[in-house]
């Protein structure tokens, strides 16, 4: 995460500052330790060099910084200054696929490295790991055949065929085997009364079952999956007396009996352990008088039964972890809900182990195995074997998106074919007695490994030319070595010219750094002008004036330098992975990694191996709890968009695998999976409603159940729209006509009423119609004068 980069820069500056303090502080550490030999000089600090040139001026210190020695005219070929280095001895390229010749498959590179380290120095080297595609897989199914698993036995009778069908999608080279266990066939674990119960433990239940057995190997790993089905069908259950089973005995024998089981060297090894009960552990055998500790060896007899079941105790978790690691076996606990928390605790102590919740009848075991294999293949975790006590290692992981995560030696959320790298710093404390040693770094469950050969460069080349009884050392009172005299016992001085028996008080002023200060810091005797430091039960006193020791550093919780460093003249020199004045602050970050793959859940900073939550409202060991933070629906929505629909900000930033570690399963509809389930709904960019459920089971496995088809609004029906438009136009036209007719009618009625009103008010005079003409007309002749 980008928020960690300032922390990395600060750590780098602190380291550089510490180194600078050694060189340019108030005093030069190389000249203040009072060393008088080349070997002692190299042990003071990685920055110190020794000059064996006899022509070096007498007042010039031979143990000094290299640049100072050159200034003092020391010839370059006479300067002893070994430099720590790393050399790659073998580095085969990483393979891309696992098919073909398995001997040529390489998942770890380089394979061999040689380190040369001088005292208290360190060197960084790199390691790359790739989960190759189509890698061979061996699956050994180890089943509890106690009476309570009777229904489970019938459920797995066709498991071989189904498992092969599913696993063929992941590998073309699969082999499967079968074994069974109950418990030690001895009282008090078995029924011994009535006598018939010995041969038939189900006698009191009016039923028949097999005599009790510890562990039996049934089917050697084979690619003939039908044989698995046939052998399972032949099996019958037995019955034990107490609740815990003897499963750890079976795990141990299935792990160490390579030839019987048929584990291949070049394959992934999966040991599937199924049970519905607790299991006995080391020292439980004493209940039956069995006191002989488990020896971690194969004891399967000719009858394929565990022959030491009644004579050897159950194995311890530590022994089991050691053997599983040696044989590169990944253990899968497929257990029922009632004991899942117990086996979850076991898995935290056994690297490379996963836990799945088994249904009461084992009907889900197929999906459980496939999911567990996917989880195993999605993680790379380094383990270290045979590390010398004087060496300490610190890791930085580069997982996805080339992001460096300090203090981490594992990567999760990977896909098959992904390549991850680790930067490893090896630091030596002091100078080990055994000058050449080796150790191994390997990913858990991988056969491939990196072998690191270490040579501790504690000696000087000039020591090979030492001259015992040299005349230069006062006529043979010492050995002339690397330009100085190494005096024999009883002689002191630069040329071994002074006998310890010659005591002159006038020389005591040379044993005090300043006038008035104690002689030899009151921790030594001044002989011949030199301090001979006292021996101490607490440690070693050194220095020109006996001013230094390796036991006067600060203590934290009762341990010097917190038990994570060495005391060097009052200062703690911390081991790798530790820092601070007390060396009480770890630089590892794996303890801060949350289940979602983020440091402190992305809500805090990792300081000294603990999360300091900075987002308001967040709390928990990894800041995983935050009631006021955006809820799970808001956080998981981006993962659904990325993994299901291949879009969203996580997809654009290529961070899908990094932030989304949950399994996604597509369903037709959401069901009630219990109180640990959260139903979520959101509307996507297409305006569709997406429904999903976030569920985390008791084993810690998180699943996103996503409804396959989002609920999107339906598109418009063209015919309906067309008819609707036409109908609307027709209705509008009819409405317009009706309104127009109504208005006309209203208007006519108003006019008629007005006419009637005016007619009623009108008053007419009687007169002839001026237009009316009678039918006859009378004319008078004005010229007629008759009578």
Curated annotation (Swiss-Prot):
PSI domain mapped to chain residues: 29-75
Ranges annotated as spanning the membrane: 718-738
Pfam families in the cross-refs: EGF_2, EGF_integrin, I-EGF_1, Integrin_b_cyt, Integrin_B_tail, Integrin_beta, PSI_integrin
Positions contributing to Ca(2+) 2 binding: 183, 240, 242, 244-245, 276
Residue ranges annotated for the VWFA domain, each copy included: 134-376
Extracellular face residues: 27-717
GO biological process, one term: positive regulation of leukocyte migration
Secretion signal, residue range per the UniProt entry: 1-25
Positions of short motif LIR: 776-782
Region listing for CX3CL1-binding, in residue ranges: 202-209, 292-312
Modification after translation: Phosphorylated on tyrosine residues in response to thrombin-induced platelet aggregation. Probably involved in outside-in signaling.
InterPro entries recorded: EGF_extracell (IPR013111), I-EGF_1 (IPR040622), Integrin_beta_N (IPR033760), Integrin_bsu (IPR015812), Integrin_bsu_cyt_dom (IPR014836), Integrin_bsu_tail (IPR012896), Integrin_bsu_tail_dom_sf (IPR036349), Integrin_bsu_VWA (IPR002369)
Binding site for Ca(2+) 1: 148, 151-152, 276
Modification sites for Phosphotyrosine: 772, 784
Residues carrying Phosphothreonine: 766, 778
UniProt domain comment: The VWFA domain (or beta I domain) contains three cation-binding sites: the ligand-associated metal ion-binding site (LIMBS or SyMBS), the metal ion-dependent adhesion site (MIDAS), and the adjacent MIDAS site (ADMIDAS). This domain is also part of the ligand-binding site.
Subunit and partners: Heterodimer of an alpha and a beta subunit. Beta-3 (ITGB3) associates with either alpha-IIB (ITGA2B) or alpha-V (ITGAV). Interacts with FLNB and COMP. Interacts with PDIA6 following platelet stimulation. Interacts with SYK; upon activation by ITGB3 promotes platelet adhesion. Interacts with MYO10. Interacts with DAB2. Interacts with FERMT2. Integrin ITGAV:ITGB3 interacts with FBLN5 (via N-terminus). Interacts with EMP2; regulates the levels of the heterodimer ITGA5:ITGB3 integrin expression on the plasma membrane. ITGAV:ITGB3 interacts with CCN3.
Family, as annotated: Belongs to the integrin beta chain family.
Job of this protein: Integrin alpha-V/beta-3 (ITGAV:ITGB3) is a receptor for cytotactin, fibronectin, laminin, matrix metalloproteinase-2, osteopontin, osteomodulin, prothrombin, thrombospondin, vitronectin and von Willebrand factor. Integrin alpha-IIB/beta-3 (ITGA2B:ITGB3) is a receptor for fibronectin, fibrinogen, plasminogen, prothrombin, thrombospondin and vitronectin. Integrins alpha-IIB/beta-3 and alpha-V/beta-3 recognize the sequence R-G-D in a wide array of ligands. Integrin alpha-IIB/beta-3 recognizes the sequence H-H-L-G-G-G-A-K-Q-A-G-D-V in fibrinogen gamma chain.
Protein's name in the database: Integrin beta-3
UniProt lineage: Eukaryota, Metazoa, Chordata, Craniata, Vertebrata
